[in-house]
Amino acid sequence: MKQDGTPLKLDSFKGKVVLIVNTASKCGFTPQYADLEALYAKYREHGFEILDIPCNQFGGQSPESDAETTQFCQLNYGTTFAQMKKADVNGANELPLYTWLKSQRCFNGFDEGNSLAPVLDKLLRDADPDYDKNADIKWNFTKFLVDRDGHVVERFEPTADMKLVEQKIEELL
């Protein structure tokens, strides 16, 4: 859903490479907004789009209104890509888009090269010892890469190296 309350038609992305990401403004991964904006600026003319879906399900790290979130991102990271209304990505009220995305690409662990991976693993394992056995979104800034034909080709956890994300985007463009 767009911030103005109108439905987003996914067919408007037909023929484009799309990175779908659940975000938060008060998260340790929030600085990834700078990387996302750099990717968007570099590749948007080549048919690349970012679909930013703020979410408050992980540590309450997106507490502000939709308008405040957009203002924060634009002022602090210069974001120019589309930001949707805040939404759930897990559970009874999750967006149908996320039900589909998770059915296409499940969780395959955190990038062990990232210093935050063991922190996230402990946090999640303490809450649910079997957290890694389902496809649910584990934290903010989980990304799904969709090709021009609408196929989900990759799932990147928030700990993934953004250089790898860029490499996969380039392969699809």
Question: Predicted segment positions?
Answer:
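N-terminal "domain-start" segment that seeds a small globular fold
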Residues: 1-11
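Conserved helix-turn-beta segment immediately C-terminal to the redox Cys motif
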Residues: 11, 16-18, 25-55, 73-77
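Thiol-based oxidoreductase modules, predominantly thioredoxin-like and allied folds used
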Residues: 22, 46-65, 80-91
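Short catalytic/ligand-binding loop motif for oxyanion handling, primarily in non-cytosolic enzymes
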Residues: 28, 58-61, 91-93, 152-154, ...
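Generic recognition of short, well-ordered alpha-helical segments
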Residues: 31-34, 63-64, 95-96, 167
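Thiol/selenol-based redox catalytic cores and closely related redox-interacting motifs
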Residues: 72-74, 78-159
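Non-catalytic, surface beta->alpha helical segment in thiol-disulfide oxidoreductase systems
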Residues: 153-173
